[in-house]
């Protein structure tokens, strides 16, 4: 995937005009379906899929990490497409949930497409590739630019994982880092997958783990793992992230994880993660247990046959 290098906000005037056209849901569209050989892909043609596109900017400096997660989800309904997008900024253990919106659009043959809304604007390349994410609200502004692809993988359930160079602009300040783009889909309007994590050891190694299903179901979640290491890329078809400690979250009347043990099925990966800050939100429901979305800033260590890596990053936990 070829992407241009990050741009400064001052270059965006022409691109923003193109963005509105490129993201318009009224133009002719090709159907967007899950790919791969998994069950989600097989059922997509007969049932309406739900989609996630998640973007996370991360930059590690010393013992601290600068995180900007953007999480988006779309679900097709008979009367249209339900869309939601959420944005956070985390630094020095403090979380700012600066954007959270849900809205409906007209029925679409490409419901997975990410669209601008309100204070959320997008830069889009040919082929509907998101090239930049912009938040503007009065004097507040935050821009993410996505650069060159560093590593890219696909999964059996149609998921795609891309690691990219990137930059975040807060006003006149620029921070360079790495961007994860994780896209997932499922048939029948169900959850596209379970919990996931993005952790990195500076510029030397980045790891992504994504579960096939949520916790609390009939089957235990199994993760797939991907890594961009100094001299090679790695994949693990079976990884377990076991909870080793939990904490209560009374607003949802649930326990949520506080630390994790990582281990791969082939014993070539091992590690542990610990939450050091979090942003948790309870959803709406009839109860007694409510939905929850929890974002954790984590630290820990991941060991592979290539070496041991001190890591810092993000874990996203959801119960729907």
Identify the meaning behind each predicted range.
Residues 14, 24-25:
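N-terminal hydrophobic alpha-helix used for membrane targeting or insertion
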Residues 12-18:
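Sec-dependent N-terminal signal peptides
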Residues 2-12:
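Bacterial N-terminal signal peptides that target proteins for export
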Residues 26-320:
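Structured soluble/peripheral alpha/beta segments that form catalytic or ligand/cofactor-binding pockets
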Residues 20-22:
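C-terminal motif of bacterial Sec signal peptides marking the signal peptidase cleavage site
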């Amino acid at each position: 995937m070829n992407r241009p290098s990050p741009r400064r906000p001052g270059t965006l005037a022409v691109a923003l005009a193109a963005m509105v056209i490129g993201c318009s849901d009224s133009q002719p569209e090709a159907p967007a379906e899950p790919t791969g050989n998994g069950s989600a892909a097989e059922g997509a043609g007969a049932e309406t899929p739900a989609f996630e596109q998640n973007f996370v900017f991360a930059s590690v400096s010393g013992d601290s990490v600068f995180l900007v997660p953007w999480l988006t989800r779309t679900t097709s309904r008979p009367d249209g497409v339900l869309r939601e997008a959420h944005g956070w900024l985390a630094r020095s253990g403090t979380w700012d949930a600066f954007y959270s919106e849900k809205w409906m659009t007209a029925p679409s043959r490409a419901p997975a497409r990410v669209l601008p809304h309100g204070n959320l604007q997008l830069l889009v390349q040919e082929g509907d590739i998101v090239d930049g994410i912009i938040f503007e609200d009065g004097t507040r502004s935050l821009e993410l630019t996505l650069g060159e692809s560093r590593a890219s993988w696909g999964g059996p359930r149609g998921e795609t994982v891309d690691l990219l160079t990137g930059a975040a602009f807060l006003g006149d300040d620029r921070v360079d880092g790495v961007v994860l783009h994780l896209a997932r889909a499922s048939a029948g309007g169900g959850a596209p997958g379970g919990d996931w994590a993005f952790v990195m050891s500076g510029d030397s190694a980045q790891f992504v783990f994504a579960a096939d299903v949520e916790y609390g179901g009939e089957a235990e979640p199994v993760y797939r793992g991907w890594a961009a290491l100094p001299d090679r890329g790695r994949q693990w078809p079976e990884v377990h992230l076991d909870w080793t400690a939990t904490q209560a979250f009374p607003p949802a009347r649930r326990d949520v994880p506080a630390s994790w043990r990582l281990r791969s099925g082939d014993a070539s990966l091992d590690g542990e993660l610990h939450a050091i800050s979090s942003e948790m939100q309870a959803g709406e429901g009839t109860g007694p247990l409510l939905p929850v979305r929890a974002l954790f800033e984590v630290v820990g260590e991941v060991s592979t046959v290539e070496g041991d890596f001190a890591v810092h990053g993000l874990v996203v936990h959801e119960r729907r």
